[in-house]
């Protein structure tokens, strides 16, 4: 049996989960069709998902149709959970991108499609909610061609709420023949030579073009009234093809971890090549760690079943492997989809329990959530001792707060969300702290040179000290101290885009230890950074704004107020397209503003595009009155020289 892994993607409220539930019901995987409104869906299984009607975590289920097993991954539709969506992309053989016939293309739709297109993932576009009043399909078709791709093939016509095929194995309209000829040279040559080309020939060519992500079929339906669902199932099993197996050697990718109500850790793996068997002993990540598979499940027709073996391209579930982390692999390193640029969160806020004695409980709960979602990073501020969580947005914060209260029984308070800034030294400086020169309490001399690098270069560490003089353990201790120091600069933000060179060292053989060097390094680094001064860097977004031409003046005024850098403006009689960069801090709510002043016609699409020196104010991430006493003594001694 062929097996495919299919992602279901959509902007929020396009009906993604409803479509998935109908696929399960139509294929016979469930006895009744779950409804989001009723809170009885299979894929949105978390209480918070059912209550709020949104998908928070990617969920996997399975159906069989036309002799093909299709593992369906229902992904979040909200931008705050983009990291979950990005992990899903790595394991897909194809995707269904769902649009709402009424709301049309949203910013999230365009972002998702551009990623699918970039990664060359075969994609079917499904226009849902065709039953809604006021639907204008002709305008939507134009929007699809303008904002998504010209290479779309509308496979059906809609008449009085019903769908009818216009292209199949046995019949194809003349204009569709021309479309295929324009996309395939072999068919074009046969067409120009007046050779006989059957509808099946055209159909098979369309299948090949979709598999290469050169053409995107468009279908219609209504999940609410089960319209077009069987046709969508037929299209999925026709156009989305399983990958060819390249090896019999086991290669598996861990894409999801969850904990059941009893606390058992459940790990979901996609078997890329080979097979995973019960009682196998397998290696993790080419390391020296081995695990034994003591239990093994897969997903079949919407439910989990115990099995002895899971084969290539299928989903395996194992329990209680504590060493597992998302992104791990078993056996050979898998060849996954490349080209994803992971988006790091650019917001953060402090969190504290309502009852101070429950702080350790909060930390334990956050650690569990981090295991399930590595994009949820949290830390303890070294100056304020506060717990800080990095976030993608307000909705994610609300979900985390609800999970802490309902799943872990701990109530917390979140402070105001802050933008995550960064720091970069302004000029090249050198700083030395000598051994046995007060107030230095460590048996070490360290000299460091700091110099700024171009934006986006990150941290570079070099050493001018030979390993013949100072061995690896001592120098590694200095490097560790540098990395630790970069976590918090003069204003409490990460220090980046700099080169740090270890330039001078002295030690006393009988008493000096690597710990002396590790502990002294942050003081040398801090004094050097103070001498250099820092630029504050703020996160930037690359944006594309599409608006009706009549709204262009307001849009440009808004962008100027947000201190954006406009790179290109192109307008015709109806539309204006504006591209550029804008600070995250000034544009957080602009997508909803665009939707409001254009009455739903405008699209404001953004993606992270690095950091630049801020032109606006910023907030510190440090309580400036809390000073390290030894640092104060170093500063005082340096000022006396």
Curated annotation (Swiss-Prot):
The keyword GTP-binding applies. The keyword Magnesium does not apply. PROSITE patterns: G_TR_1 (PS00301), G_TR_2 (PS51722). Residues 1-244 form the tr-type G domain. GTP binds at residues 10-17, 74-78, 128-131. GO terms for molecular function: GTP binding; GTPase activity. One of its GO terms (biological process) is response to antibiotic. SUPFAM superfamilies: EF-G C-terminal domain-like, P-loop containing nucleoside triphosphate hydrolases, Ribosomal protein S5 domain 2-like, Translation proteins. InterPro entries: EFG_II (IPR041095), EFG_III/V (IPR035647), EFG_V-like (IPR000640), G_TR_CS (IPR031157), P-loop_NTPase (IPR027417), Ribosomal_Su5_D2-typ_SF (IPR020568), Ribsml_uS5_D2-typ_fold_subgr (IPR014721), Small_GTP-bd (IPR005225). Keywords: Antibiotic resistance, GTP-binding, Nucleotide-binding, Protein biosynthesis. Belongs to the TRAFAC class translation factor GTPase superfamily. Classic translation factor GTPase family. TetM/TetO subfamily. NCBIfam families: small_GTP, tet_protect, tet_protect_Q. Abolishes the inhibitory effect of tetracyclin on protein synthesis by a non-covalent modification of the ribosomes. This is Tetracycline resistance protein TetQ. It comes from Xylanibacter ruminicola.
């Amino acid at each position: 049996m062929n097996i495919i892994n299919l992602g279901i993607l959509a902007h929020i409220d396009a009906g993604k989960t409803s479509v998935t539930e109908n696929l399960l019901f139509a294929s016979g995987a469930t006895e009744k069709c779950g409804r989001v409104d009723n809170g009885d869906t299979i894929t949105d299984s978390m209480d918070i998902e059912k209550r709020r009607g949104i998908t928070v975590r990617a969920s996997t289920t399975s159906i069989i149709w036309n002799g093909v097993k299709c593992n369906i991954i229902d992904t979040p539709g909200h931008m705050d959970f983009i990291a979950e969506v990005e992990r899903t992309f790595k394991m897909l053989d194809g995707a269904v991108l769902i649009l709402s016939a009424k709301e049309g293309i949203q910013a999230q739709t365009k972002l998702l499609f551009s990623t699918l297109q970039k990664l060359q993932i075969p994609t079917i576009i499904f226009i849902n909610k065709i039953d809604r009043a006021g639907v204008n399909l002709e305008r939507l078709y134009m929007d699809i061609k303008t904002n998504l791709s010209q290479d779309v093939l509308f496979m059906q016509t809609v008449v009085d709420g019903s769908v009818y095929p216009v292209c199949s194995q046995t019949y194809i309209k003349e204009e569709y023949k021309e479309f295929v000829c324009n996309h395939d040279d072999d068919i074009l040559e046969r067409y120009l030579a007046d050779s006989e080309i059957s509808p099946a020939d055209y159909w098979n060519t369309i299948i090949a073009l979709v598999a290469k992500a050169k053409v995107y079929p468009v279908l219609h339906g209504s999940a609410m009234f089960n319209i077009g669902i069987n046709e969508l199932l037929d299209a999925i099993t026709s156009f989305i093809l399983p990958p060819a197996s390249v090896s019999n050697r086991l290669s598996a990718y861990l894409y999801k971890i969850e904990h059941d109500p009893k606390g058992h850790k459940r790990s979901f793996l996609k078997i890329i090549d080979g097979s995973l068997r019960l009682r196998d002993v397998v290696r993790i990540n080419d390391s020296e760690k081995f695990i034994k598979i003591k239990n093994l499940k897969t997903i079949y027709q919407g439910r989990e079943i115990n099995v002895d073996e899971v084969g290539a391209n299928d989903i395996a579930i194992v329990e209680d492997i504590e060493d597992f982390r998302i992104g791990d692999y078993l056996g050979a390193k898998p060849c996954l989809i490349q080209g994803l640029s992971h988006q790091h969160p650019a917001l953060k806020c402090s969190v504290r329990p309502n009852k101070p004695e429950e702080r350790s409980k909060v930390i334990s709960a956050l650690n569990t959530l981090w295991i399930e979602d590595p994009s949820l990073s949290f830390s303890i501020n070294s100056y304020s001792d506060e717990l800080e969580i990095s976030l993608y947005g307000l909705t994610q914060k609300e979900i985390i707060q609800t999970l802490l209260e309902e799943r872990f029984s701990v109530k917390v308070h979140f402070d105001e969300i802050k933008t995550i800034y960064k720091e970069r030294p302004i000029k090249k400086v050198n700083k030395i702290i000598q051994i046995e020169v007060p107030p230095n309490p460590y048996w070490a001399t360290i000299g460091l040179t700091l110099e700024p690098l171009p934006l986006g270069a990150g941290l570079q560490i070099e050493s001018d000290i030979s390993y013949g003089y100072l061995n690896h353990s001592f120098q590694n201790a200095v490097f560790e101290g540098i990395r630790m120091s970069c976590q918090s600069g003069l204003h409490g933000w990460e220090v980046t885009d700099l080169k740090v060179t270890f330039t001078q060292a002295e030690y006393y053989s009988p008493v000096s230890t690597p710990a002396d060097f590790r502990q002294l390094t942050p003081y040398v680094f801090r004094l050097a950074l103070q001498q250099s001064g820092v630029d504050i860097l703020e996160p930037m977004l690359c944006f594309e704004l599409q608006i009706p031409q009549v709204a262009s003046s307001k849009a440009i005024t808004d962008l100027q107020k947000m201190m954006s850098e406009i790179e290109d403006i192109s307008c015709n009689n109806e539309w204006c397209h504006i591209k550029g960069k804008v600070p995250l801090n000034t544009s957080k709510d602009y997508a909803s503003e665009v939707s409001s002043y254009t009455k739903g016609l405008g699209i404001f699409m953004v993606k992270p595009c690095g950091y630049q020196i801020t032109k606006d104010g910023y907030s510190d991430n440090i309580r400036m009155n809390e000073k390290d006493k030894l640092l104060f003594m170093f500063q005082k001694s340096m000022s006396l020289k």
